[in-house]
Amino acid sequence: MKKSIITALFCCTLLTFSQISYAQQSGVGLGAILNGPTGVSVKVWLNEDFAVDGALGLQLSENFQSVYIHSDVLYHNNSLNEELNLNNASLRTYYGAGLRVIFQDFNDVVGLRLPIGLTYSLTNAPLGTFFELVPTFDIEPAFQFSFAGAIGLRYYLN
């Protein structure tokens, strides 16, 4: 029952952010994420400094299957970009908070994420890369602290 409630809250959060991003109509990036998880990544800019990102990853093997989903609200800081005086590129730090859910064969996992990262993009190209470190606090089925890391590439549609 507890897992169902947490999963329902997670899905409601995603639907809320998808409605906000739909009204924005710009700044949607789709791409790949490697390592934590490995799968598909999406990022939707809400304004110049705030974005919502998410990822979906699958792990399939003969004896084990899992589906990984996360969503984060991110704040981007422009001070590094201003210090380096980059003319044709953007290098920004970001941090935020979010949730992750891992659906497994035997034990579903629900946790809090606190991503800290760096994003780089060229002003004349619709591509962006990112690198992030993520302290994670799993709260279900048992409390556990861990670190994850990921790199990725996104193509921006608008």
Language-model features: where?
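Predominantly the C-terminal beta-signal and adjacent terminal strand-loop region
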Residues: 61-66, 123-158
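Residues that define the transmembrane beta-barrel architecture of outer-membrane proteins
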Residues: 26-28, 34-36, 50, 65-69, ...
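Short glycine/proline- and aromatic-enriched beta-strand/turn motifs that initiate or cap beta-hairpins
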Residues: 19-60, 68
